């Protein structure tokens, strides 16, 4: 292990002792904001320090075993102990490096997930509906809530565009690598000749901003229009102008919300989505710069990149970023995404570890 990392771990151990002492003081709860901050820091430091303690114990065991090598009667036993200690040190070293990886401040946040139909017309819209169901079923498996924020339905079913809010601890950490182009290859229900068509959708996953204050929304930069909410095919479904369209003039971003019960609710939701989009745009710009520097395949934030193909005739799903192919399409479309998300997270961690080693 690098001396700089050992020094960092020693500093974290000292800091944990300091935080533990501060939390034990009678006046610790006088300032509840600071108390919560210290409690959170204690929870973050404890696992790192515990693993580091185990690492040092394993090093001590290795040193003891190496001393026994000089005793002819203990030589075989010592060799076994040395091998076991080295294996343990290697595993703990890897675990410590992962624990020291920079944390994404957005990982625990709720998300907005946008699915837009691309090339393929009605079939792309149907696939957008399938993707929304896939993410909704995945959310159910994790006991997260799903709310439809805005939906532009197509006449044959599915969505031209749909925005959902997924509420649950860690939603962003598990789904942030879903952003990008998703391609489907299958025989559409409307295809009489049985020919396979290729369609595409774009997915965008954005962490929900904690508060609107996270992004400064100057009223001068906003144009707010109201109109009547409409259903599939464009028919109006109410008689009041409850739907809201907000245009962010400096960037040209447009957000529409019409699924709320009132104009006020739709405006509030639209402002949240706009804040998330602006936050996300800033984050993607930074990610793209970092990714270019380290030639990253994961987490570049490039929405134009085709990241996954869903091939129905072959029953397979392929994630092109990590060359992962699974022959369990039905399960994946029913929300069984764990194998894919775990592999993407592992690859991202490997990239970060490689960057630490540079």
UniProtKB/Swiss-Prot annotation:
The record describes its post-translational modification as: Methylated by PrmC. Methylation increases the termination efficiency of RF1.
Q: Which GO terms describe its molecular function?
A: translation release factor activity, codon specific
> What does the entry list under GO cellular component?
cytoplasm
Which terms are listed as keywords in the entry?
Cytoplasm, Methylation, Protein biosynthesis
Highest taxon in the source lineage: Bacteria
The keyword Metal-binding belongs to this UniProt entry's keyword annotation: no
Pfam families for the chain: PCRF, RF-1
Chief subcellular location equals cytoplasm
Coiled-coil annotation: which residues? none
DNA repair among the record's keywords? no
Q: Which Gene3D superfamilies match?
A: 3.30.160.20, 3.30.70.1660, 6.10.140.1950
State its location(s). Cytoplasm
Question: Which residues are modified to N5-methylglutamine?
Answer: 235
Extract the InterPro entries matched here.
PCRF (IPR005139), Pep_chain_release_fac_I (IPR000352), Pep_chain_release_fac_I_sf (IPR045853), Prokaryotic/Mito_RF (IPR050057), RF-1 (IPR004373)
Could you tell me which HAMAP family the record lists for this protein? Answer: Rel_fac_1
PANTHER family for this protein: LD18447P
The family assignment reads: Belongs to the prokaryotic/mitochondrial release factor family.
**NCBIfam families the record matches:** prfA (TIGR00019), PRK00591.1 (NF001859)
Q: What biological function has been recorded for the protein in this entry?
A: Peptide chain release factor 1 directs the termination of translation in response to the peptide chain termination codons UAG and UAA.
> What is the official name of this protein in its record?
Peptide chain release factor 1
Q: Which gene encodes it?
A: prfA
